[in-house]
């Protein structure tokens, strides 16, 4: 009769300081299919170590161990996990059920790692529990089951993938006599159905129910009667094997790991929430700073554009503050005409200015009077509250008309609904109000000077008596590079004047400087937010490391029922990523709430959540989970199943 399990000269020793302590010494043993064997011995005799080797949880230091003729020493860890999963079923003294799972879910665990479809394994788990008399306890957690019921759940779990070999470690040690008798009756039934049952016990009454008693003392077998060949029922279920394609197995494995991770998180809600808190704050900070920062940036740039972007100012002299008399008359009307003819020019306006007294009735105020063309308001993107700008005829005829700014209108006409057509005195010259322009922000804040605009011909000839221009402002067509336009302007006027007696001021340079400044500030704030995200990630890693320590026995149970190291790694890594993703989702929700509140108190801000910002938050959460979950997951995957099961 060929042995199912065969040990030949097996020894097992463990390091203790500088010495090796031998626990098993030159063990040779054969166990045949369908036997019911009891391994007995006092505490410390080595019987549990022998069971761990038989169950492929441990490897011998020397000698060979064969399972169905296969030398276990030639198998890698994944192959050993497969062997445990497909051929062995473990029954533990303390049941080793996972507290956050129901009875049926505990029974399903071996099939999960075998990659069996959910519906199939749920059906089989219920059938096994029904067979063991637990049909009314299928959805109960272990805490609501008696000791005997928990042990029967443990037996059902051992049978889930077939359980060709049942390894029972003190199966009745934590039970009352009645429950113990029920468990032993079940084991005898399994023996009768063709299962190989190996019981490790120190109770002679339990051992007496086996067909063969192997006694071990001080690591050596002192009693090993020959196997009795008996005819058995061939009722052992075949090992459950997943035959689905590789990609489907991977998808199923990932889905189940995700489900188990969610259940583990739900089992410790408060700790999970506190773990997420750092991620929530970090993601909310990053998203809020990116989104609100972008809104602030757009608002600043919009304000700058409102002052007239794509504009180039031309002034006489070498630079601001140059009052050299030889440059004062550098800019002429002919220069304006030449500039207006350029194909890349949208519009151009001259400017002359002087302080004047403006009077209406008994109201007398000081204003800054600007002589400009009708294109001035287009150049600076200004709109009108009332009336309109002056036309070409008024410009040519040096018409006595004026456009007021909103502040001037308020000072002169505090109670009038419409001021177009009213006559005021500009100096000593009567002028007709033809429009009121909207207030425009200054680059340096709002000035306290009141502004009015007259046709530059009127201003030059009737008021100032000068033929030159104080400045020219050019609006470049959309799509034209302002730097190139500035170079062409410089080249044009230098050729006309024969020298460079002017300088230019490109508003786009202000825009670019503002963009650079806001980007730098936003980057700095984002880095601060990222630091909070890193702190949150470290919190996740810390809690996950604690979780690995707390759940060491759970890891050992999972490995005993067939989980590979990669399965454990995947599960804990997914848990970390899931914590970060849920925290990220809550962080995004928090940032949306912050944005909503900001819009209530800052109505001028347009805060929008772009797909890029949301995708970035998702990637940040995932990356944080992977980065800070890797170390705890790796530590969990590296645990030795025997050590893990022995932890309290």
Swiss-Prot record:
Keywords: Antibiotic resistance, ATP-binding, Cell inner membrane, Cell membrane, Membrane, Nucleotide-binding, Translocase, Transmembrane, Transmembrane helix, Transport. It is a multi-pass membrane protein. SUPFAM superfamilies: P-loop containing nucleoside triphosphate hydrolases. One of its GO terms (biological process) is response to antibiotic. Residues 5-243 form the ABC transporter domain. ATP binds at residues 41-48. InterPro entries: AAA+_ATPase (IPR003593), ABC3_permease_C (IPR003838), ABC_transporter-like_ATP-bd (IPR003439), ABC_transporter-like_CS (IPR017871), MacB-like_ATP-bd (IPR017911), MacB_PCD (IPR025857), Macrolide_Exporter_MacB (IPR050250), P-loop_NTPase (IPR027417). GO terms for cellular component: plasma membrane. Its EC number is 7.6.2.-. SMART domains: AAA. Gene3D superfamilies: P-loop containing nucleotide triphosphate hydrolases. It comes from the Bacteria. The chain crosses the membrane at residues 273-293, 417-437, 523-543, 577-597, 611-631. Belongs to the ABC transporter superfamily. Macrolide exporter (TC 3.A.1.122) family. This is Macrolide export ATP-binding/permease protein MacB. The gene is macB.
